[in-house]
Structure formats: structure tokens, C-alpha cells
Amino acid sequence: MQYTQLQTLTNYSFLKSASHPQELVEEAKILGYHALAITDECSLAGIVKAHVAAKELNLKLLVGSYFELTNGFKIIAIAPNRQAYAELSGFISLARRRASKGEYEAHLSDLRFRLQQCLIIWLPYFNNHISDVDVTTLATAFKQRLWIGVSHTLIAAEQRLFSHLNKLANALHVPLVASGLTYMHNKNCKPLLDILTAIRENTPIQQLGTRLHSNAEVNLKPLHELNQLYPEALIQQTQVIAQLCNFSLDELRYQYPKELVPSNTTPIAHLKKLVKEGEAKRWPQGTPEHAQKIIAMELGLIEEMQYEYYFLTVHDIVHFARSKNILCQGRGSAANSVVCYCLFITEIAPGQINVLFERFISKERNEPPDIDVDFEHQRREEVIQYIYQKYGRERAALAATVITYRSRSAIRDVGKAMGLEAGLVGQLAKSLAWWDRTGDLIKRMESFGLNPETQKTMQHFFALVQQILGFPRHLSQHVGGFIITQDKVSDLVPLENASMPDRTIIQWDKYDIEAMGLLKVDVLALGMLTALRKSLETVSQYDAAVYSLATIPREDPATYAMLSKGDSIGVFQVESRAQMSMLPRLRPKCFYDLVIEIAIVRPGPIQGDMVHPYLRRRDGIEEVHYQNDKIKSVLEPTLGIPIFQEQAIRLAMVAADFSGGEADQLRRAMASWGKNGSLLKFEDKFIQGMLNNGYPLDFAHRLFEQIKGFGGYGFPESHSASFALLCYASSWLKCHHPAAFYCALLNSQPMGFYSASQLIQDARRHKVVVLPVEVNASGYESHVVLTNHNTSAPPNIIQLGLHMIKGLSILTAERIVLAKGDKPFTTLKELSLRAQLSSADLQLLASADALHKLTGNRHNSRWQAAALMPHSPLLDGAELEEDALNTPAPSIEKNIQTDFNSTGLSLRLHPMALLRAQQPFNRCKKQSELASIHNGGFAQVAGLVTGRQRPGTAKGTLFLTLEDETGNINIVVWTSTQERCRQALLTAKLLLVKGRLETKDNVTHIIAGQMFDYSHMLSEFDIKSRDFH
């Protein structure tokens, strides 16, 4: 008996199925099915994952989708060929795009005119009141391509429905087919299916009634059960349909957009012309010979692989951005390409790193290249809309990201669906830290008096939470991956509306795109590019010599001296706790040191035990030894320690005689060596190749283990070098133009590790004067005060802008600035009338103390604002008089509290300065006093919790940053202490820490022994930390 399952929903019919696509494919293969149709509801979101699994298992896969039409029809459409697939994908796109996100609207007329080649299975059901006209329309429209689907799931009246369908089939001359009805791969998933139904319906499971599946018969069934459920003729019809279907996703062929090539030339000729033009700009004195050879090699491979259109497409996007003065820079493996450098896609010159094109493109890999380009985060939307305008919404769309269940969301949704007490569920979810794993949930449950081992309800709850983890919840948009095609995108993959206006996304994520070999252009957002442009614009107003990244002086000793002290708050890529600790140890002195600095504080080098040997060799403590000149040529820049991915590739090439493509395949195998055994087939070749070249066996094994240790996580040198350019630029600006630098960071928030308050604290430590928000002095953004600046030193005063005020709209702020013009406001009433402000606007300004120069103090501002009548056009131009109101100014404590609540910071006293005289803070050392404590001595400190980090490389160690009135205090919390002081760690705003002080390589931190939460003393302060995984 041969059987094809025709109605199968995966968990990409979000919250309607309890099985992953792979699970359904695997189960169908085990059960001996001839073929399986994946028919997610108005979606192809799960089809690629099913396709990959089916290919591995040699199971025939049918591509289809299930729809509920507006007239009540329930149908399945299956694509028998490539044209039918394009129709189906387009039909899904139409239905999705005419409805709001997550919904769809499909009409019978759409079906008739848009699915000319698809096979249709009509699924009549109980109480399905379909007009005879519609039935006749369906039967007439699809003639030999229509079946009536029958599903037997052992429910009441099923036999009566079957008799009715028999009569209907005879009357219409339409065959019946056993369509099956599958929402899970086996019956054990029924509890999960029920809980998913409750989540979808937003109703506790106890109240769902008939909305629940009445039994567990909606699974993939063994062939002998199917034989008992369906007449043989109905099962045979499944094979008729399967035999009509010859389409595979492997038939999809991506077509690059072609309009960028002039009609009188070829793609490669046009690309060569642009590269030649770029060469002249990059090397005005003539292209170096070695660069010419690399360019010729790259262009030859690009032509052979037919990637010309891809490079032209990315070049066009970058050219648009540069024409609009939008800073952008390519990164990642693309920086290994000299062609990309000549096209101004990347900024790393061949001389700055040892470029390796195989890391970017190789024949053996036979995959489209991947070029990631960062754009200013505040202006990236201009680039996105340019792409939409140039190619149209039919030919350009963003990739999807699948939002899946994580611990907290799983606990909340499962708990609510089970009808558990809402307060308990909320507390349990909040008690989980981001670093907790599934096993930690048991501990948290036990801390609330819940025992999953003895309490059946909790046992069920825990089991369901575990099962739902990783389940897809809904589609969201990718951070910037664009699919751009010559024809309609919907011929390849369905489109749907994103939650953001003027955005469309495809139904596949980046893994699906990679599996199908589609071109993706990553248009990414980077806050530092925004900050750099704004910094340079400010600097150019008083220093004409510095106006772009290219004009920043190179290899500046003062900049490297600043970094070597760990003074890197706000600096790109080296502002984390780990990087700030590494800087004084590595002490960078040149650009390449920054390339290493950025790459070495990563999981790969740390897990590969490469950091300490490198530092010892750098300090001259450990001798550098190379096996021979070939090894030296690869490892000399990093003192014999492999740090970069490119070095792993080169070592395989020079030591084990791998080709460039083979070496890159080795790197990719290393990236997934923990997930599959693909690395094993390379190990023998690597070891044998080294033995053949005369290397000792122990050295070969040691080298392979070393590069294996970082292969999955190590940074590409090209990527690190791209980031090092921005790191150096931001460092130089911080060192020489601190006011412009910090002002730009404030105007580019949110970005980076630090809040506006922390940045301002650091700015003041660098002798920058920061002025509070004030309606007559402030623009919308913060700005550097240039008035009367006539010294050789850069200006050092920042005036905070109206954008700092929480809740004040951009339009209101711009009205204030426009109304002020060259004539400052003299009274509150004048401000209200000229800027057409509402009472709410005035109260926001008063709360931020932005009116203090008009009213005297914050209390006066609030009273006067409250007393003002709403703006009336009748009063425009009227004489304005008002009685002065004089109330006592708020206390310093109240002012600081209100500052934080309205702007997130205070320029008055630091909150710790207010508390310093009180117990127990009067016994705490300030950050500025820690130098007086000997190494290993006891230390007691307190401060605002401004950051929590728990990197995966730190073996569970948590790093806290506390801020007091004199600076930042670094706290290290071992795992044993974390559990003991868990609640304080998770929620404290104000923390007191007792521990042991450690100082090494000019880095001081405190190993926490005890921690105490004193947040209640700042309960009215709106203070938040920035927490990073």
C-alpha cells in the first residue's frame, strides 16, 4: 500500500500545530509514506525546513497550503509544477498583503483566476453553509484538478458526513481523496496541541470546550490504521495526486536584478569599469602590482560564478547612501575582497590586512557571497525606501526572523493557558534571569513552594514549558536582510506585511534563504556610524582639517595611550567590561593591535586557550617559535597564535595542502562541529597532509585542536579590521574632541553599552562642561556651544537638547525651536502662545526644569504652567502680562529625583553623594579611594547598578558595573555568590557590595562576597541598568 499525506500543518501555522516540519517529515518516513504534503495555513514559512529534511531522508515532498476563504470554503492548494508554485506563492502574498499582519483574506474569485495550475482539495465540514452557486463555480473552474477531501478522526457524525460527501462527489463528478488531518507527528503531542490552542484563543484550557481537538487522532497514522479508516479508492487517489506533482524547491532559480547594467555592455564589463574607476580613487598614484593581481583573480572568479549582478546591486545601494552623505561601511568576509574595496563597499585596504578572497567566495562552497553593509541607524530608513522605490514592493522585500518561545514567554503563555494564578506566573517569569537554562526553572519553582516532582499540575506545567521552548511564535522582520529579484519576489517566496508601515517581508528566514541559495543584501543599522557623522559635522565647524573619516590622523600616540588605560567608554567595540579589562593588558600601539584587540575578546580565542599565550608572548615572557617559514608567514602577525578565521584557512592550505575552497569548507565544518560530525572527514586529511609535509604528529594534532577550538566563534580578520577602523575613529574623537564626541553619542541614543547619564558622567571626567535643558538655549538635539570660541583648544561645553525630555514629542520640540528663532522667550505665557503648547507640554518642560530661567525654579514652573489657560488662536498677538509667582525651590533631593524621572539623568549631585553621609554608605569607599586598598584587601562599596553582563565565555561569571559620584566600580560575581544573592543581582538599582579587591595590569575590580539591595532608598528614582548577555 502506498499513501501520501495531503493535509499537514507544521508549527509554522503559528500556534495551530504541535510539531516541527522536520519531525513530521521524519515520522512520515518512519511510517513508510510515499510522500508528504506540507500545507501550512496561507503560508510557506515551514516548507524549506521540511524540504531540507525530506531531501536528507529521500522522502517525496509536496508543496501546498491550506486556506479558509471568505465565503466559508476550506481548501488545500498543491503545486504540481514550477508555474503552479509561483501561482500559489503569489496567491498567499495577495491574501496576506490585503490584511493586517498575522491575518489573511482570500476570496473564491482569487482562487478561480490566480490558481490556474494548482491542484485543489475542497474540505467540506459540518454546518458548512456554502451556496450551490459557489460549489458549481468551484467544480467548473477546476474541473480535472479538484478533489473532495475526507478526514477520519473518529469523531461523532463522521460517517454521516462521509455519506453526504459521496453523494456530492457523484453529483459533481469529482473524486474523493483521503486528505487526512494532521496537526502533530504523534499522539504524545496532544497536551502540547491543547495548550497551543489555549494560547491562540487567549482562553484558559478549562474554558475552551469544543474549540479543543476532541481526541488525539490528528496525527500521522501507521499504514494499517489508514487502511482501516479509508476505502482503498480514497487512498489510491492520494497517489494520483502525488504522481501529478513533480515540483521540488530545488527548481527555484534566483534571478539577479539586471537594470543596473547599461544596454550597450555586459555585466562583467560594467563591473570592471566601476572597479577601474574605484582603483583610480583608491590609488591616485597607480594601483600596486599585487593589488592588480588580486583584482584580476577576483574578477575572474566573479565572472565564472556569475555574481556580477550581485556586486553591482550592492554598489548601487552604497553609492546612493554616499550621495546622500549617509555614512556606511561593509564588514565581515566582504572586507577580504579588493573588488569591494575598489567599489567603496568596504574600507579595508589590502595593505592593512592579508586579504583572503576564499573566505568570501569559493568555487567549492558554490554559495552566493554575503555582503553586510552597515548604515547610520537614524538614516537607514532612507536606504530601505530607496530600495523599495527603485525595485518596487513586488521585487524587493525584507527577510523574516522567526520569533520563538524563550523561557519567560513560555512560562507566561503556558501558565496563563493552564489557568494558573496570574500573580504567581508573573513572579515566576520575572525570577528567571536571562542566563538561566531550563534546569534552573525547577529551582525557581521550588523557591516559590512549587514542586514539579510531587505536584501533578506543576509537573504538567514544567513539561509543557520545556516542550514549547524554541517553538515559533510569529514572524518578524530581519534586522536588514533584503531579497531583491529581477522578477516578482512572490514567484519565489510569499510576501506579507510587516508590523512597521511601508515594509514587506518574505515568509522565509535567513537560514531558509541560505538553504535555497537566494541573494541577500544586508542593509544593517549601526549607531556608531550615526555618532561618527554627527561628531565630524561638529568638529568641521571649528576645525576645517577634520571633516570625514578619511581625514582623521592615523596612528596617533595619544589615542593609543588613552585606550591603553582602558579609557574607552563610548568607543566602538571596546567599551564592554571584558574589552576595557583587556586594553591595559594588550596596550595597543598601532591599528593592527586594535584588530587583534577586537578579535581576541571573543569565545573562539578564549575557548581555544589563545589569549594568555598571546599576551605572554607580547610581553616577552614566552618565546615565539615557528615550525617553519610557511607557518611563520601565517602566524607571525599574531605571534604564533591563530586568532582569526582566515589563519585557520591559510594553515590548512600551507601546512596540509588544502585548496582554498577545501580550507574554507574546513572552517565551516568547525563552525558546526558540536552539532554534527562533518568535521571528522577533514581531520584525517588535515593530519595526513601535515605528516606528508614533514610536520611531527603531535604538532599536527595540537594545531588542529587549536584551530578547532575557535573555528566556530573566531572573528574573521576582515570583520575585525572593519570594526577597528570605527574603533580608532571613535577613539581619536574621544581623545581630541571629547565634547563633539559625547554630544554625538547623546544625539544617537539608543546605542552602545551606556546610558545618557553614564556618558555624561564620563564626559565630565574628561573636563567637558554639560549644561541642562533650557528652552531658550536648547535646540531639539544637544549641541556643542561654539559661541565666542576663539581658542586653539576644541570647545568643551555641551548644551543638552529638548530631546532629552521624556514624553516630549519631536513636533513639540521643533515648534519651540522654530518659535524662538532669534528672539528668546521672556515669560511662560509667551512661550505657550508663540510655540502653541498644550498644558501637558508645559508640564513636561516644567518637570525637566527646562523653564527655570523663565520662572526661577521648578516649583514656580509647575504652578505657572498649571495656571495658564490652553492656547487660543484669538489671543495670538495680544499683549501678554502675568503676575510673577514665587514659591520656594524644591530641595536638592527632590530636584535630583525629578531630574532622573524626567530626563534620565541629573547634572546636580550624584544620587550617591546624597546618601554618602547615611548608614551604611558612610562606611563605603568611593571609586576614587579604591587605590588606597592593597591588592587582596577587603573593600566595601556602593553605587547605582548601571550594567550587568554575563558573557558566554566567562563560565557563568557575572560582571556588574556600579556608579558612584567619582566613577565606575567593577564587580565580579562568581556563580556561587550569584545564587546566594540572586534577587539583589536581578533587580537592585542601588547595591552595596562587600568583597575582595583585585588589581592586575592596571585593572581594578572587586570579587563580590556579599551583596545588599538598598533600592528602597531610591524607590522614586527612575534608574535602569543596561543588561547584556
Swiss-Prot record:
| Signal peptide positions on this chain | none
Kindly give the SMART domains that the UniProt entry links to this protein: POLIIIAc (SM00481)
UniProt KW Nucleotidyltransferase keyword: yes
Cross-referenced InterPro entries, in alphabetical order? DNA_pol3_alpha_NTPase_dom, DNA_pol3_finger, DnaE2, DnaE2/DnaE/PolC, DNAPol_HHH, NA-bd_OB_tRNA, PHP_dom, Pol/His_phosphatase_N
Q: What are the UniProt keywords, alphabetically?
A: Cytoplasm, DNA damage, DNA repair, DNA replication, DNA-directed DNA polymerase, Nucleotidyltransferase, Transferase
Gene Ontology biological-process entries: DNA repair; DNA replication
The answer to whether UniProt assigns keyword Phosphoprotein to this entry is: no
Gene Ontology, cellular component aspect: cytoplasm
Q: Which family does it belong to?
A: Belongs to the DNA polymerase type-C family. DnaE2 subfamily.
Record's protein name: Error-prone DNA polymerase
Taxonomic source organism? Saccharophagus degradans (strain 2-40 / ATCC 43961 / DSM 17024)
